[in-house]
Amino acid sequence: MSEQIQIDTGAFQRRVNKLLSCWKDSSADFEQLNQVDSLLVVMGGQNDDLIYSKTTAIHSWLLGYEFPSTVILFTKDSVTFVTSASKAVHLEPLKRSSTGFNLEILKRSKDEASNRALWDDLVSRIDAQGSKVGCLPKDKPIGKFADEWQSVFEKAQSSKDFKMIDVSASLSAVWATKDDDEIKAIRYASKMSSAVMSGYFENEMSTILDEGKKVTHEQLSERIEGKLDDTKLWKRVKGLEGADLSLADWCYTPIVQSGGEYDLKTSAVSSTKRLQGADGNGGVVIASMGIKYRNYCSNIGRTYLIDPHNSQQKMYAFLHEIQTQLADKHLRAGATCKEIYSKAVEIVRAKDEKLVASFVKNVGFGIGLEFRDSAYVLSAKNNRALQRDMVVNLSVGFQDLDDPNHKGEVYSLLLIDTLRINDNAPATFLTDRVRGTNDMSFFFKDDEEEEEEEERRSPAKPDGKVTPGGKVLRNKNRGAAHDDTAAEKMKLHQKELAKQKQEDGLARFAGEDGEGNASNEKVFKKFESYKRENLLPTKVADLKIMVDHRAQSIILPIYGYAVPFHINTLKNVSKSDEGEYTYLRLNFVTPGQIAGKKEDVPFDDPDATFVRSMSYRSSDSSRFTELFREITELRKSATKREAEEKELADVVEQDKLILTKSRAYTLPEVFPRPAMEGKRVPGDLTIHQNGLRFSSPLRPDQKIDLLFSNMKHLFFQPCDKELIVIVHIHLKSPIMIGKRKAKDIQFYREASDVQFDETGNRKRKYRSGDEDEIELEQEERRRRSQLNKEFKVFAERIAEASEGRVSVDVPYRELGFNGVPFRTNVLLQPTTDCLVHLTDPPFLVITLTDVEIVHLERVQFGLQSFDMVFVFSDFSRAPMHVTSIPTTSLDDVKQWLDSVDICVTEGAVNLNWGAIMKTVNEDPYDFFAEGGWGFLQSGSDDGGSSESESGSEFGSEMDDGQEETDEDSDSGSDFGDSAEDESGSEGFEDESEEGEDWDELERKAARADEKKRRQQGGSDDDEDSGKKGKRR
């Protein structure tokens, strides 16, 4: 374990300097720190009973780890560690990076005399600074090390008259504002907390109540705790890319409460009573949980209403309104904790004075390395001000309200989220916020029970403002409460999704480092011709111009020295003849050139001195001609190699396939796509320990290995209404098959055999009618059914062998619609997680979780088709266009997209997506701050392109914008290989080259016919009109 410890020296440097800077700050937040001459932090042995303390927090903040049995002494210009020799090994690298302060490490040993001398040295250092010593009195170190130091320091304290001052509150202020790394850790923790709450607890709790299982609060809490190790859960969570899940842990044991006994404090525990709420009279379940990542905490709490009374729903909606107002209007940098709580009380008092007594005594606290930072409690007595980039745990609730469903009993409501404080903008939710309290209600009553209950009640005038909703289990429909039409519900849902996208965008790009543009920044590349001088060719002694193909360099003689220049530093070379001399001029890439954007490359030090050009002359014309040819060819080969490397940059080198030693499952006689080199031959697909292997006995030298770790999606497409049955695998990263890279690999078998007409044979002689045709049809149906069964079982075995990495997804043909994703009009079919076309290459696989927003273009009355644009969350990828979708499919497409929680907008014209995405990538945060994707819904009718008349304008629009794309391609505005990202059809590039679509060809044909008709004087009007209206 010790070998794995790596301290972030940069973070240590920044944070020590921040501490020393705050020490010198005279503001009220650092009042105690200003009073002391030195700061002493003592960590004793491991104390499992003490989870959170200022001592462990300062260790985690500075070092990223806890160093037991260690003393840290801070002065205003130095840091001193006293620790064991084994721990000192990990601290030594910090000495090399310490600037602005001195760093010393005193190493303890087993020699008591030398240890005593260390203690005396430390006491003298404290005494030299002054008598006022900052300390953390609430932290009580334990163990032999702590006892030894304590005895030494108590004696010194009596003789030196040291005055101990508690600086806990000041330290809280020092690390209250979080840097980007800390925010990232808390965001990971918050995502995980939200995932457990919504992805597991909701379903588990509702199932327990629905099926009447007898499970206690404590048992359910233990189940929740066990989900931390559930890798399947985390694979489904978006936003955890790059997170090391081994660094996650629970902040506290999850809390579950129900049945009229509720404690809204953070110290509450789950009782041994059973989960209640499904007794027919309703109930309230409160759950709170928090996960920490790299010791940075998060927290989330929710209340679930079971068959709630109308007054309970209204009260929960009011609590949600309180949280929304605090987050959107009052949680800002500069506001004091006291002001926040006062605003919350004002909102409650305005609703009902009596509710103030039931309202919580504080509305949250600062959260981070400590789960509850006592210096930043949002209560009525705390005058500390919030700061930008602080993270708070906002907790609002009502305690012990009268339960209308159970006379004489009470219920409580609680809503907790983790938020980041901004300057002049609403606080950012790091946990998934509650959009509406209707989704937090569960209904178990039958319609008949509800009708009987309504009959018993006195008739009352219905409240038109109450929004129906809630989760209904086992199809127990509450249809009488649903007044909104499907279209209105979709519109409301889309508004919520759009608002969520806007907030997520602001949160995602709020960091000062411009997080979103990191992938587009140009990277300085260092080229090295020769590592040592003795590696230069021996011929350089002749001081002649040389071209070294092996080192990819040109060696030029300059003032008696042989100077190598890497070929990538060369811009161009020219040769000219003047009189009896031949001139060779070499121009190099340098900063500040007035040149094309391809030369706009970064430099290690732009202010250094550069050689811009070199000219040589010689009377040996043939020699310079040969040099010019060699340099030109070397430059061409370097450019070609660079292009190939860029093309294959995303291709991964897979690990070795581990062959299974036992009997392996095999799918025989299948064909691969893309096909391997040579003639098409069938082969066997076999499941091994960590992946699949396709091999053919006819070509033993060729095989395809696919590892489970590189699989992203697994599809099974039956042969119903198709000619082939397919098992299709979409990879995370492309692999090489032969000389082509592929991201989509499929294995198929043809569904129909060649049939022979048996007319005139013996069997036909004794049969009449269509018995043969009927028998053939029945045989084909049996064959298709058998093929479907065989391929489906094999796909399920792949999913089982992958141990949860992939699951089998089947396209829903009934939800399919026609469109043109590349050049051909094909059937596109939704699956659970994707939109796919798998029947013919080029394949299309769009992962829905990667989609940011979908925009429908050319949606206007009178047109027969529309276009669909998928914008991806990774803005560096080009949007994916699917054109010429029949207008008859518009409502079905919108309903499908809405059902998978994708934000949908629509407009009447085609947009210039190259320019739009360039703007987004330049400053994503500014884009979202100015409204984000809202312009697509409100302003798309006004922008950019002319209206279409009969077909898609996308093809012609791309042609018109091609010059701009070429010019801007090197400025960071061009995208990655989006077609390769979305489909593994690289092997079929010859089938999917750019060209005009049918609509464009028809328009050209129509114009040609019109021109011909005019020349002939209108004699063929009728015929031309017929041709013009004809569609393919």
Swiss-Prot record:
InterPro entries: Creatin/AminoP/Spt16_N (IPR029149), Creatinase/aminopeptidase-like (IPR036005), FACT-SPT16_Nlobe (IPR029148), Fact-SPT16_PH (IPR056595), FACT_SPT16_C (IPR048969), FACT_SPT16_M (IPR013953), Pept_M24 (IPR000994), PH-like_dom_sf (IPR011993)
Coiled-coil portions: 633-653, 778-803, 996-1017
Compositionally biased tracts (Acidic residues): 956-1000
Pfam families: FACT-Spt16_Nlob (PF14826), Peptidase_M24 (PF00557), PH_SPT16 (PF24824), Rttp106-like_middle (PF08512), SPT16 (PF08644), SPT16_C (PF21091)
Low complexity: bias regions: 938-955
Family per record: Belongs to the peptidase M24 family. SPT16 subfamily.
UniProt protein name: FACT complex subunit SPT16
Organism: Mycosarcoma maydis (Corn smut fungus)
